[in-house]
Structures are given as structure tokens and as C-alpha cells.
Amino acid sequence: MTARVEITADTISPALDTAVRALQGDGERLMLEDIGEYLLRATRDRAALQQAPDGTPWAALSPGYKRYKDRKRPGVPILKFDFHMLGDQFAQQVSGDTLLVGTNAKYGAIHQFGGSIDRPARSTEVYFRQERDGTVGNRFVSRRRSNFAQRVTLPAYKIAMTARPWLGLSTEDETEVLAIASQHLLGQPSG
């Protein structure tokens, strides 16, 4: 048994006309905005799960930083501190036929790709409490509670940031983006 499909100008024209009409006027912008909204939701969901678009879990925090963060903000996720998260600053922008999804956070790229942060040498004052017998405690205190200050110089150093990809398309995202585009091309936008 043989099946035959013939595509002629008569059969393809109505479908092409529908697709062209769907993208005329605001159609393309609306399609890109719908795709952008979906990608924002998917990216936030992945950030909450602390995983890359391919589903791999983010690398754990370095032991020293984990101790610090657990002491300061126990139970707060990897890319979250002071109740702000990289994911809280995700945005989408449609300009012409282009959709941009990302963040305006200056630290977004270093978390996405990893890398090295150079910290310059610096001098600062540290504050202690000196007892009446002249001994100085070994714990830092606030300037207000201090009666002994010492100037220290910290050398330059590097911080190695492990990549924790948060932006990108999973296989599920690709399928959903195609579905949204198909709906718009068929003249059935979701919005």
C-alpha cells in the first residue's frame, strides 16, 4: 500500500495565509512576549530547584562560604542571600523580532559561566575590646563597642566561582516554546 501527499499552491496557501496574518501587526510581538513569560517561569522554577537547564543540580557552595552563609542565613538556597535571589531579577524584553531573557544583576554572568573574581589588596581597621589588665580579646567587635583598633592590610586574592547555569532551554522548554509558536502561527494565541 502506498500513501501519497501532494502539496500544491491550493492546499498550502490557506495555511501560509493564516501564519502570515498571525505574525502581522502585533502578532509577532505577542508571540515573543508569551514565549518570554513562559521562559521566565521555567527559569524561576529551575532556580528554586537549584538546577541547570539540563537538570543537573548546581554545584554545592564552597565549605567556607557554606559555613558563613549557614551562620548568617540558615536554610537560604544557593543563589539567594538577604532574601534576594538572582531569580528575583529575571526579566524579558522584546525588541522588534528579538526576545531577550536574562537578568540585570551584575553578578548574573559569573554565576552562569563561572570564573575568577580578583579582589584587590586593601587596608582596613579592625576593632577589639581591651580589658582593664591590658589584654586584647581575640574577637572582633563593632566600632561602637570597641576601645582598641588595629590597622590591617589584606593581600590581593582571587575567588573561584563555580558555574551554576540558570539560563537556557531544557528539552521541555524547547517543546513548550515550539507549542507556543505553533499556537500563534495557527491564530490561536494563549493570551
Whereabouts are the PLM-identified features?
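Short, Lys/Arg-rich flexible segments
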Residues: 1-191
